[in-house]
Amino acid sequence: MEWAYYGSGYSSSGTPSPVGGDGDEDSYMTVSSAPPKRRAGRTKFKETRHPVYKGVRSRNPGRWVCEVREPHGKQRIWLGTFETAEMAARAHDVAAMALRGRAACLNFADSPRRLRVPPLGAGHEEIRRAAVEAAELFRPAPGQHNAAAEAAAAVAAQATAASAELFADFPCYPMDGLEFEMQGYLDMAQGMLIEPPPLAGQSTWAEEDYDCEVNLWSY
C-alpha cells in the first residue's frame, strides 16, 4: 500500500494533490494547544507518563514506550520501545494521524510535514512499521546521546552538591540539654499531682477522732 503525505501535497495514490488549508500544520491540534488531561487528586502509584508528550511512558531508565488507542474501540496498538522520548513522541504522531486523521492531537506541529503517514484504514502492522520508521529519523547520534546523558548526570550532581553545601551552613545542635530541661518540667508536673509526704516528727493523731478532753493551758 502506498504512503500518504499529510500536509505535503501528496495523497494515498501517489499523485500530487493541491495543497490547501487542510494541509496546513495549524489544522492539527497539538499538546501545546490541547494538553492531555491528568487525573485529579493524589496518586499512590509511580507516575510513568511523560510530562509533555502524549502517548509516551517511561519503562526503564533511558527507555520510552508508546502505544495508541483505536478511536472507537478499547484495543491498543503497541508501537515499540525507543531510546528517547522524542522518538516515541514522533511514533505516536504517525499512528495518531493514521487512526484519527485531522482529529489527531500531535506532539509536534511539524509532524504532518516531516513524517510519512499510512492512509486512513491501514492495518496495525502497517501503522507500527510507519511509526518505527518515523522514530528512526530522529534517533540521535551516539555521541549526542551520550553527551545528553552526561549533561543530565552533571546537573543532578551539581544539585546534590548545592544541597549539601546549603545544609552545611546550618549546624545541627545537640538536643541533650533541651531534653533534660523538658524532663525537669515533666517531673515538676507529676509532682504537683502527688500528695506531699508527711513532715518528720509529725503525729498522725490529728487525723483521728477522740472523745477525750485535752487541756490546752496548764498553770
Curated annotation (Swiss-Prot):
Its main location: nucleus. Pfam families: AP2 (PF00847). Residues 52-109 bind DNA. Disulfide bonds: none annotated. Residues 1-19 have a biased composition (Low complexity). Keywords: Activator, DNA-binding, Nucleus, Stress response, Transcription, Transcription regulation. It is found in: Nucleus. The keyword Transcription applies. One of its GO terms (cellular component) is nucleus. The keyword Manganese does not apply. This is Dehydration-responsive element-binding protein 1E. The gene is DREB1E.
